[in-house]
Amino acid sequence: MLTISEIQDHLYIMLKEFDSFCKENDIKYSLSGGSLLGAIRHKGFIPWDDDIDICLSRPDYEKLITIFPKVFHSNYLLRSIERNNSKYPFARLEKLDIKIEDEYSNANQFLFMDIMPVDGLPNDKNEVVSIYKKRKVYSKMLELCDAKLGHGKSFSRAFIKSILIIFAKCVG
């Protein structure tokens, strides 16, 4: 099992390869989420971060989805709804030669980068807040679909989580 430091070293290499690919194909991206916070606050990664978060404009995201299989390394897999190999509303770039373990998930996992398309938002602040609240609920439900039953930091959390997992799988 890789240490968090080893995972971050591999992620850095993965990011450099992704950066080269994007420059060669005129795709503009930026770090987001915890990756952006880590780059600014820690001059690298947040100490516990085990993935990279990237965002692209919708046109660059669609370009990436279209050209990726033709020009990127074979030891990578791009998962997305558009490629019919993911249930998430964003892409995930997996490095197939580095498997990672997640004690809370049943999903097979490889080292990965999450790649999010960025679309415009309404001008009304209340609508924006509503969109983000819904997104958070949907994201949690998708995450629970792969979670392990009976696993949690305490018995009560594991019990509640098990009920939520069953609900999330029923809803879809």
Region spans (language model):
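Membrane-anchoring alpha-helices and their flanking helix-loop junctions
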Residues: 132-137
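Short hydrophobic/aromatic beta-strand micro-patches
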Residues: 55-57
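Active-site nucleotide-donor binding segment shared across nucleotidyl transfer reactions
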Residues: 19-52, 61
